[in-house]
A protein has these predicted regions:
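Conserved alpha/beta enzyme-core scaffold
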Residues: 1-237
Length: 237
């Protein structure tokens, strides 16, 4: 029997899980595949002093930008944050703690945490500020940094379709960090655009098994914004 529970609204799926000071892994890459409705629910709930683990920090008033605007985030662990002016303001003023992490290292830290691996060594960041305060070890004449796996209190992710048992399908590049973040959370809450009957999805196309999904909600009103819309000149088409 599936342990995945289906909830009518995002706030119903997440409200009793949120507490001040918790660590939350958030899926998505830029604005692609972000759990928009669950982020809205977090803003509505008002939990504060959060540590957010995410590849990006959203943009102003979109995605995690909403939680930055409402001052709910105390610390962000991310690899790229350059498109959010409110993030910039809070970081430069000392209001926001930031841990910069190379993108591949961030993905592996979350994957390791989800797999029960406490840490791993990597050459990425040796000789840079990324290595500051971390254990260094030499293997075969090469220096490596010890990076710790990330295990969060909660993971929130976004998928395209799921069946009622939580087996999920992502749409193209919207898969991004969502799979990895799901396993890194003690509890995973997923939002999808469509919930289908158990057995109706092609088993060979399941990207995330339902064993990783504790709670499921069907979202609505997705704007699917494009961070940078670039088109060719008509003459070049």
């Amino acid at each position: 029997m599936s342990r995945t529970t289906i909830h009518p609204r995002a706030i119903d799926a997440i409200a009793d899980l949120l507490t001040d000071g918790m660590t939350i892994c958030v899926g998505g890459f830029g604005l692609c595949g972000i759990p928009e409705r669950l982020i809205d629910a977090m803003a509505e709930h008002g939990a504060r002093d959060l540590t957010i683990v995410s590849n990006n920090a959203g943009i102003d008033n979109v995605g995690l930008g909403k939680l930055l605007r409402s001052r709910q985030i105390r610390k962000i662990v991310a690899s790229y944050v350059g498109e959010n002016k409110e993030f910039e303001r809070q970081y430069l003023s000392g209001e926001l703690e930031v841990e910069f992490c190379p993108q591949g290292t961030l993905a592996e830290r979350c994957r390791a945490g989800g797999a029960g691996i406490p840490g791993f060594y990597t050459k990425t960041g040796v000789g840079t500020l990324v290595a500051d305060g971390k254990e260094l070890k030499e293997f075969d004449g090469q220096t490596y940094i010890l990076e710790r796996g990330i295990r969060a209190d909660l993971a929130i992710i976004k998928g395209w379709k799921a069946d009622a048992s939580g087996n999920m399908i992502f749409r193209k590049t919207a898969r991004n960090f969502n799979q990895t973040m799901a396993a890194a959370g003690q509890v995973c809450v997923a939002e999808v655009e469509e919930i289908a009957a158990v057995g109706s999805l092609d088993k060979d196309n399941i990207h995330l098994p339902g064993v990783y999904v504790d709670r499921l909600v069907q979202g609505d009103h997705y704007d699917k914004p494009i961070e940078f819309r670039t088109i060719r000149e008509r003459s070049a088409a």
